[in-house]
């Protein structure tokens, strides 16, 4: 689901602040 993807991207962003995702 979109929410699940959002949470996954948020976790990755917390691990790698350099990488930013935009939906």
Swiss-Prot record:
Residues 1-23 are annotated as: Disordered. Its main location: secreted. Keywords: Disulfide bond, Secreted, Toxin. One of its GO terms (cellular component) is extracellular region. It is found in: Secreted. GO terms for molecular function: toxin activity. Signal peptide: none annotated. Expressed by the venom gland. Contains 7 disulfide bonds. Belongs to the phospholipase A2 family. Group II subfamily. This is Basic phospholipase A2 homolog Vur-S49 analog.
